[in-house]
Amino acid sequence: MAINHIDWAIKAENDWKVVKLIIANNYDPEDILCYHCHQVAEKYLKAYLHYKSLQQIPIHDLLKLLDKILSIEPGFSILRSKLKILNLYGVRPKYPDDYFAPLKSDCEEAIGASKAVRKVCRKFMKLDKKKLK
C-alpha cells in the first residue's frame, strides 16, 4: 500500500489528539506535550510534501522540511517563526540524559505554534473542512 498525504495527516491528527488530552490533564507531562506539538507539525509538513508528490526527506528538522516546501509554495513562509519554536521539541524531550522541563508558557507557545502549522497545512491540502479518521 502506497502512503499518501491523508495517511500522514491522520498520524498528525493522532498527535493533535494527544496534545488535547495532555492539555485536559493540566499540561502534564509538559515535555511530552511539547514533543507532540512538534510531531503535529512534522507530520503535517510531510503530508504536504506527499500532497505535492515531493520526495520525502527522513529528518525531524522542521526548518529543513519548510525549505523544501518553500521551493514550490512560498505561502508557507509565514510558518518559519512557529517552526523555529517547535524545532526545540523534536528530539530533546525524548531522552532522559538532558533533563528538560518546559514551563507552562513554553507549552502554550508550542500549542499555538502547532495549531498554526496544522491550520495552514490543512488549508493548502484542502483538508480544512474535512474530518480525518
Model-identified regions with their sequence ranges:
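Terminal alpha-helical segments
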Residues: 1-133
